[in-house]
Amino acid sequence: MEELPSTAVGIRLQDGVILGAVRRLSYGGYVLSKSAKKVFPISRFGIGGAGLFGDLQALTRIMNANIKYYELYNNRPISTRAAAKLLSIILYQYKYMPFISEVLFGGVDNGEPQLYVLDPLGSLLDDIYAAVGSGARVAIGVLEAEYSEKLTLTQGRELTIKSLRASAERDVTSGDGIDILTISKDGKINTEFLSS
């Protein structure tokens, strides 16, 4: 499979989870947009990724509806692990016409931050940090060199930004600003945009 355009990064820390992605939207060497948001809050969770932009948007809408349905039907909140497993099942259901996206999914349950990585066919991996997309090789190098479980949420945010900026310098399908989604240990979600 070819590398999917764009770059997204996720980091799990003791204080929370951080997801980040670049804004450039490109296909086949052509830049379609410089303002494509690829990190979204869903209920108490965050989702982000790289690949086909429409597929990532569709997955976000599908997950939003399924999480609401689960919580209404069961009269209790869905856990991060269960929501990630639900996303895995949805991706696998479409294996013959897959969503061409690599997805990062994060949340906090009872003060425990969690980060999951999913491929287009629904493989589900629990990880402490991850990078997906065409700029992942550069971003993961920065993460591996500087990640520590002792990082604060602010330091993790800075590491996310540094890894995405490094990928934007070396990958033509990455760039044009960064979206950051932070979920703190107490469940508060913060989103922000940083220009290039």
UniProtKB/Swiss-Prot annotation:
Keywords on record: Autocatalytic cleavage, Cytoplasm, Hydrolase, Protease, Proteasome, Threonine protease, Zymogen
An MF annotation (GO) of this entry: threonine-type endopeptidase activity
Domain of life the protein comes from: Archaea
Gene3D superfamilies named among the record's database cross-references: Glutamine Phosphoribosylpyrophosphate, subunit 1, domain 1
GO cellular component terms, A-Z: cytoplasm; proteasome core complex, beta-subunit complex
Proregion span(s): 1-6
Regulation of this protein's activity per its record: The formation of the proteasomal ATPase PAN-20S proteasome complex, via the docking of the C-termini of PAN into the intersubunit pockets in the alpha-rings, triggers opening of the gate for substrate entry. Interconversion between the open-gate and close-gate conformations leads to a dynamic regulation of the 20S proteasome proteolysis activity.
InterPro entries, alphabetized: Ntn_hydrolases_N (IPR029055), Pept_T1A_Psome_bsu_arc (IPR019983), Pept_T1A_subB (IPR000243), Proteasome_sua/b (IPR001353), Proteasome_suB-type (IPR023333)
Substrates-to-products reaction catalysed: Cleavage of peptide bonds with very broad specificity
PROSITE patterns listed in its UniProt record: PROTEASOME_BETA_2
Active site: 7
Keyword Protease: yes
Enzyme class: hydrolase
Localization in the cell: Cytoplasm
A Pfam family: Proteasome
EC number: 3.4.25.1
GO BP annotations listed: proteasomal protein catabolic process
Functional note: Component of the proteasome core, a large protease complex with broad specificity involved in protein degradation.
Family the UniProt entry places it in: Belongs to the peptidase T1B family.
Quaternary organization: The 20S proteasome core is composed of 14 alpha and 14 beta subunits that assemble into four stacked heptameric rings, resulting in a barrel-shaped structure. The two inner rings, each composed of seven catalytic beta subunits, are sandwiched by two outer rings, each composed of seven alpha subunits. The catalytic chamber with the active sites is on the inside of the barrel. Has a gated structure, the ends of the cylinder being occluded by the N-termini of the alpha-subunits. Is capped at one or both ends by the proteasome regulatory ATPase, PAN.
PANTHER family hit by this protein: ATP-DEPENDENT PROTEASE SUBUNIT HSLV, METALLOPROTEASE TLDD
Protein name: Proteasome subunit beta 2
Source organism (scientific name): Metallosphaera sedula (strain ATCC 51363 / DSM 5348 / JCM 9185 / NBRC 15509 / TH2)
The encoding gene: psmB2
